[in-house]
From Swiss-Prot:
Localization annotation: Cytoplasm
Family: Belongs to the RRF family.
Gene3D superfamilies with a match to the protein in the record: 3.30.1360.40, Ribosome-recycling factor (1.10.132.20)
GO BP annotation list: cytoplasmic translational termination
Name this protein carries in UniProt: Ribosome-recycling factor
Gene: frr
A Pfam match: RRF
Record flagged with keyword Isomerase: no
UniProt xrefs under SUPFAM superfamilies: Ribosome recycling factor, RRF
GO CC, any one term: cytosol
Native organism taxonomy: Bacteria, Pseudomonadati, Pseudomonadota, Gammaproteobacteria, Alteromonadales
Keywords, alphabetical: Cytoplasm, Protein biosynthesis
Role, per record: Responsible for the release of ribosomes from messenger RNA at the termination of protein biosynthesis. May increase the efficiency of translation by recycling ribosomes from one round of translation to another.
GO molecular function: ribosomal large subunit binding
Length: 185
């Protein structure tokens, strides 16, 4: 029973970490990366469609993304969707493809992004601590129902705390990597 609680807590913490990685990948660094455009939806035949289903996105070099649109009639819609996104990008179409040069980040913008990244990381830590609280509550419930002893309860809480510490370290490591990536010029 305790093992199930610990395993559940660990799985939920892992999901929180994956969600945080997803949030971090959406935050633009100085480098071109195809995942930068993941959240963009393109109106395609009257239906909002994810950009990656309408075009192939590749990083041409460290400052340029190249898109190959599958249906040439959708090029204007793709360009418009990219311009309307809050990424501040200006796509240029050339024949059947679209190139997106990424402007270098200003020092002020980098600091703003670092602030955003730190807030996201803190949200990840809070989510992990909430999972710990839930797991410890489940252990306390078992103790109240006399299904486990106090020693087992204490040991389980220590295990849950060590799992929590491990995931908090992973969040801090992700944050440090992202900050370093953002500060590279």
């Amino acid at each position: 029973m305790i093992d199930e609680i610990e395993l559940d807590a660990q799985e939920r913490m892992e999901k929180s970490l994956v969600a945080l990685k997803g949030q971090f990948s959406k935050i633009r660094t100085g480098r071109a990366h195809p995942s930068l455009l993941d959240g963009i939806m393109v109106p395609y035949y009257g239906v909002d469609t994810p950009l990656k289903q309408v075009a192939n996105v590749v990083a041409e070099d460290s400052r340029t993304l190249a898109l190959t649109v599958f249906d040439k009639s959708a090029i204007q819609a793709v360009e418009k969707a990219i311009m309307q996104s809050d990424l501040g990008l200006n796509p240029m179409s050339a024949g059947g493809s679209i190139r997106i040069p990424l402007p270098p980040l200003t020092e002020e913008r980098r600091k703003d992004l670092i602030r955003v990244v730190r807030n996201e990381a803190e949200g990840g830590r809070v989510a992990i601590r909430n999972i710990r609280r839930d797991a410890n509550g489940d252990v306390k419930d078992l103790l109240k129902e006399k299904e486990i002893s106090e020693d087992e309860s204490r040991a389980a809480e220590e295990n849950i705390q060590s799992i929590t510490n491990e995931f908090i370290k992973k969040v801090d490591s992700l944050l440090a990597d992202k900050e370093k990536e953002l500060m590279e010029v």
